[in-house]
């Protein structure tokens, strides 16, 4: 653990001591080395259980894939931001990179925390750098509105969790995840216990987000700069899923009767948000709503608590993290050239940028869960486990899969095919940096096809 945390903290010093000319190459290289070093965490499988660095930090098969995804994303965010941030004054560039590094540090400590209260503190700490990135480097004046939505939705959802954790500490005498999972099931029967159950999960359902409390996400995605969108889609939403998987195993037997309304919202949300995608004119908003749709499947899977559903949830979270981040990078390459996110104004780009169209095609096929991508493995496991839980769910999940395929192809056709506008005929060519960025997103996803058990979490 420390072999990753210490170099990450050293990256703060590197950022502030590097000469202006070498700031971006040095920070990118250093963060890429950390990402490669983090791949060693893949060796923790179920036989080995927890691997402790100390009493408060440990890795297990559930947290290892998410930790690696977090480390993998930092060099990609720095690469993606280089074009539009490198024109700013040097002090702003350093602050921007520092915020990204601090976000990675908080996320590493959140995913590896063994104490629930430490997890809660790190969960909340990620708010601060994300909020600054959105409100300071966002594209339009609506970024302040988006920042307010993001802050208040997350805070209002998180406060009941703090009260619930304090009550848990009072009852059980400990908040260690390792200790809490072994006592006898809690005898939860009163109305107060039902409120406590809801308080434990609502923060994570807002973060995922569940349909109904998802309104902050499209706003935050649309207004955030590219690095903000990438980290939000790839890792911050997964904090909600990870937190749910950690805490829901402690809340039985109440989950069996309390989960129904949330399950219905999650599965209905898959159809609703997928349908909203078909009506979008803003490219980033379309990708943001597709994230809500995918995370609805994850929320439903975690609620039913079977080995298959847990494996499907973690697999889909990792696969979606890589694919949605790649889609935001592709949307950003379009935006940097056309200065518009409107689908109608950027048609027929395949003629000018044929290789970029190939990346669009691969990313969209992965998004619609083409065999044999990890997205398909995750969705199949989730849909199968939901079908075993209730055969009626196949109608909703099946329809959701069809609409997902429809909006993915719609997004590809609207951006790449059709007659090219006159104002697009003088576009800048694609750069090696952009192709490297997309390679580093999509090649790991394709390699996971060869050994998917690396991201199956507890069940392997």
UniProtKB/Swiss-Prot annotation:
Membrane topology reported for the UniProt record: Multi-pass membrane protein
EC number of this enzyme: 7.1.1.2
GO BP terms: ATP synthesis coupled electron transport; electron transport coupled proton transport
GO molecular function: NADH dehydrogenase (ubiquinone) activity; ubiquinone binding
Keyword field contains Signal: no
Any one GO CC term of the record: mitochondrial membrane
Pfam families (UniProt xref): Oxidored_q5_N, Proton_antipo_M
Reactions accelerated catalytically: a ubiquinone + NADH + 5 H(+)(in) = a ubiquinol + NAD(+) + 4 H(+)(out)
Record field: transmembrane: 22-42, 59-79, 93-113, 114-134, 148-168, 195-215, 225-245, 258-278, 286-306, 310-330, 351-371, 394-414, 440-460
Keywords carried by this UniProt record: Electron transport, Membrane, Mitochondrion, NAD, Respiratory chain, Translocase, Transmembrane, Transmembrane helix, Transport, Ubiquinone
Compartment list: Mitochondrion membrane
Protein function: Core subunit of the mitochondrial membrane respiratory chain NADH dehydrogenase (Complex I) that is believed to belong to the minimal assembly required for catalysis. Complex I functions in the transfer of electrons from NADH to the respiratory chain. The immediate electron acceptor for the enzyme is believed to be ubiquinone.
NCBIfam families: NDH_I_M
Protein family membership: Belongs to the complex I subunit 4 family.
The protein's name in its UniProt record: NADH-ubiquinone oxidoreductase chain 4
Native source species: Squalus acanthias
Gene (UniProt): MT-ND4
């Amino acid at each position: 653990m420390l072999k990753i945390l210490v170099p990450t903290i050293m990256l703060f010093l590197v950022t502030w001591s590097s000469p202006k000319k070498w700031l971006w190459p040095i920070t990118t290289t250093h963060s890429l080395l950390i990402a490669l070093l983090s791949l060693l965490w893949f060796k923790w499988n179920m036989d080995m259980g927890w691997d402790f660095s100390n009493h408060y930090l440990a890795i297990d098969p559930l947290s290892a894939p998410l930790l690696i995804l977090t480390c993998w994303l930092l060099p990609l965010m720095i690469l993606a931001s280089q074009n539009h941030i490198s024109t700013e004054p040097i002090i702003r560039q350093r602050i921007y990179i520092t915020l990204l590094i601090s976000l990675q540090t908080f996320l590493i400590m959140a995913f590896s925390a063994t104490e629930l209260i430490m997890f809660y503190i790190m969960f909340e700490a990620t708010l601060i750098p994300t909020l600054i990135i959105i409100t300071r480097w966002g594209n339009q004046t609506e970024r302040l509105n988006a920042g307010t939505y993001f802050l208040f939705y997350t805070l209002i959802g998180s406060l009941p969790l703090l009260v619930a954790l304090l009550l848990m500490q009072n009852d059980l005498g400990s908040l260690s995840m390792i200790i809490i999972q072994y006592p006898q099931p809690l005898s939860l029967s009163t109305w107060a216990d039902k409120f406590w159950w809801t308080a434990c999960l609502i923060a994570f359902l807002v973060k995922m987000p569940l349909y109904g409390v998802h309104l902050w996400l499209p706003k935050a995605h649309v207004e955030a700069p590219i690095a903000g969108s990438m980290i939000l889609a790839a890792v911050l939403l997964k904090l909600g899923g990870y937190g749910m998987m950690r805490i829901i195993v402690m809340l039985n037997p109440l989950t069996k009767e309390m989960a129904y309304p949330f399950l219905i919202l999650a599965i209905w949300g898959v159809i609703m948000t997928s349908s909203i995608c078909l009506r979008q004119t803003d490219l980033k908003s379309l990708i943001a709503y597709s994230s809500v749709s995918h995370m609805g499947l994850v929320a439903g899977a975690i609620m039913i608590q079977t080995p298959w559903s847990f494996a499907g949830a973690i697999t889909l979270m990792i696969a979606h993290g890589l694919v949605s981040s790649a889609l935001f990078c592709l949307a950003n390459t379009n935006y940097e050239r056309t200065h518009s996110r409107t689908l109608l104004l950027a048609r027929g780009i395949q003629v000018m940028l044929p290789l970029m169209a190939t990346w669009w095609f691969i990313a969209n096929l992965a998004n619609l869960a083409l065999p044999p991508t990890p997205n398909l493995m995750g969705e199949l496991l989730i849909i199968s486990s939901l079908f075993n839980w209730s055969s009626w769910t196949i109608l909703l999940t099946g329809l959701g899969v069809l609409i997902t395929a429809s909006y993915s192809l719609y997004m590809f056709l609207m951006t790449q095919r059709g007659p090219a506008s006159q104002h697009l005929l003088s576009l800048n060519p694609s750069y090696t940096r952009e192709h490297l960025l997309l390679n580093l997103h999509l090649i790991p996803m394709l390699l996971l096809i060869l050994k998917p058990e690396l991201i199956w979490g507890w069940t392997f």
